[in-house]
Amino acid sequence: MSTSITNDFETRRYRLTDVARAGDAATRTPIYSTESTSGVVWVLKPGQEIKPHGHAKADDIWICIQGEGVFYPAPGEERPIAKGDVIVSAKGMCHGMKNTGTEDFIFVGILAPVPAD
């Protein structure tokens, strides 16, 4: 699920309480997009996941804000992640995650360059 891009370049500030939304599946809310990068806020309820995938032309950086889960650095491989962690996946590298905790898992994703694929 995805909503519209905010692109609030007047204040250049986004409040998680205003943009973080949970849904029936992992929910991606775009907050900005420029010619070179894009930023999103992801919310995963307990048990929800982002399947392992990669981007042919872009790096993807995840800044973990809340919760705990497992990161998929490769299909079939898991590593624990939690609030305060930063995940860096260079172009072509596999990444995905699952919320294994009891609260929503929230992270900010920065993708560059765009388009990613």
Which residues does each PLM region occupy?
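Short beta-strand His + acidic residue motifs that chelate non-heme Fe in jelly-roll/DSBH
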Residues: 50-52, 71-72, 89, 95-101
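Short, conserved beta-strand element in jelly-roll/cupin
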Residues: 43-45, 56-71, 110
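A generic "binding-loop/recognition-motif" signal
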Residues: 37, 46, 57-58, 77, ...
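A short hydrophobic beta-strand segment most commonly corresponding to one strand
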Residues: 41, 103-117
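Conserved short histidine dyad/triad with adjacent acidic residue
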Residues: 25, 40-55, 91
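A short, N-terminal "cap"/entry segment at the start of jelly-roll beta-barrel domains
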Residues: 1-38, 51
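Short acidic-glycine-tyrosine-enriched beta hairpin
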Residues: 75-91
